[in-house]
Each structure stands twice: as C-alpha cells, then as structure tokens.
Amino acid sequence: QNREFWADNSDWLSLWIEYIKEWDNSHQKFEWNCKGCEDGNIRDKIVQFRASGIRVKLPTFSPALNLVGTQVPILPWVKLPSECIPKYSDAELEQYGLTREDISYGRYLSVKEAAALQGMGQLKFGNLSKTRIYEALGNAINVDIVKIIAKKMLSYE
C-alpha cells in the first residue's frame, strides 16, 4: 500500500518532505484514526499533538488523556467567543495563509470535560495548575469502570 501510494503521489510528496524536514520530529508524523471517514477535514475531529506526532480522531472517541499536560485534545469545531480570538494583523494572517474565520475556531478540552471523561466531573482540584490537573487525570483510572469491576469482584462467589 505504501509503495503504491508513493508511486502515485511522489511528485508532491517529494516537495512536501523537503518542506517538513526541518519541523520537530513530533510534527512530522500524522496519524489519521478516523476509519470510514476519509474526507481529510480535521475541523470536525479531535486533534492532539503528541510526542509521537499529530493524532486526529473522530469525536465519537476521546484520545487517551496523557500524563503530559501539553498534549490536551483540541476541539477545532468550537467557535470562540470574540474576546478569545487572537488579535493578529491582516499581514500576519496572510503570512501564514490564514483568515479571520480560521482563527475564530478551536479550543482545548476543558479541565471539567477531561474530569467528566474520567467519571470525576464533580471533583474539586483545589489550587492545582491546569497542567497538574491534566497530568493527574491522565494518570487516573475511569471511576465508572472501577465501580463496574469492583461490583463484579465483590459479588463473585
């Protein structure tokens, strides 16, 4: 499959490889975990920058919360409130091929959402930093799963 893909696309891939070879290793690998959805659009998918590369998943599954607070999943389809939109000049946007619309969307999964994914939606984190909270949630086991396992184990005869 890979050889056939290269043969069919080597013209533009060769140029693209030259373009990205100066990037960080973690940005050179692109993982498309969207079986059955080959539209190439990431705007309606969950995006996560990981040490191993950029991972894209359907929003029907959350990527694993990671011990590293810098790998928080991104929700690109969420429209930002106007006061949260970065203030870039037209020249800066043009330099990167972006429009005002492009920068009006996308935010990280919130601490509250991450806690809910682990079954800890009501948990209070005191005055821990967001990074420490994400790290703790990434190291946690889902509370609902623990309850199911505990019930099975305690009722075993």
Describe the residue ranges of each PLM region.
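C-terminal target-recognition/interaction regions appended to catalytic cores
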Residues: 1-157
